[in-house]
């Protein structure tokens, strides 16, 4: 039998058959995908074959094959730094939910996510959530951040789950697609799913007043069928986003504004760091490239996985950019 993995708890997988029936399945022994060193061999979104095991009181299944994936998105494993964790597979879009505060989402985190999604062939749409909660200064910051990413070709949406702003536009994009919500804990992923599909009643939790960080409410990634013809994968909140399996020379290729300037650099293997006659650094000096994006690039290049909590909006360079672009 063939089906799609709707939920993974690490040892058991909920699979929906092509006939619409759900079955709890597991794997036997080691199950590895060719060329992929991951902590989880099977991910939500995978198309799998499975056999029924009817020898027990409760009928379960055993997964025997994973079909080739159209794509998948990964991050560095929390416990095993040299291995990856597959978040989900076979996606049409990923929606990265961003909040300016409660909790804050930094450009470093956004850029690391975008680099990984681009590397694995997944289109990302940035969703600025909770816009109804921002004061004037926060709205200015949100609009400036949106400007940075729209300028380099990323689609951006502004939504409010509580007031319903932007919900219909989001639903129109999701219709007949398999998509995923991702972002920090507390950015409102489950709340947004509930706003689109109130009958789901996904569990939500408020932000910790002490840490201003979200608290996990989604424990495992899980796919849901929505009434307007969409399939959404809700994922646990991500604190950091470690990048794996990427050579230094290829990183700039996943920054669209860097990639289009690469042929103008003096050296073919230019890392846009210390080299002379670098078109990217020249564009940076002329304010044609965002300083926050360049800073993120350097952090990724240096293998610094600890910068996702900080941002550089208070940097004088950023402040002057904001004033100039308004």
Swiss-Prot record:
Zn(2+) binds at residues 265, 270, 272, 278. Binds 1 zinc ion per subunit. Its cofactor is Zn(2+). The keyword Hydrolase applies. It is found in: Cytoplasm. Residues 80-241 form the CP-type G domain. Its EC number is 3.6.1.-. It comes from the Bacteria. One of its GO terms (cellular component) is cytoplasm. Keywords: Cytoplasm, GTP-binding, Hydrolase, Metal-binding, Nucleotide-binding, Ribosome biogenesis, RNA-binding, rRNA-binding, Zinc. Its main location: cytoplasm. GO terms for molecular function: GTP binding; GTPase activity; metal ion binding; rRNA binding. One of its GO terms (biological process) is ribosomal small subunit biogenesis. GTP binds at residues 129-132, 183-191. Monomer. Associates with 30S ribosomal subunit, binds 16S rRNA. One of several proteins that assist in the late maturation steps of the functional core of the 30S ribosomal subunit. Helps release RbfA from mature subunits. May play a role in the assembly of ribosomal proteins into the subunit. Circularly permuted GTPase that catalyzes slow GTP hydrolysis, GTPase activity is stimulated by the 30S ribosomal subunit. Belongs to the TRAFAC class YlqF/YawG GTPase family. RsgA subfamily. This is Small ribosomal subunit biogenesis GTPase RsgA. The gene is rsgA.
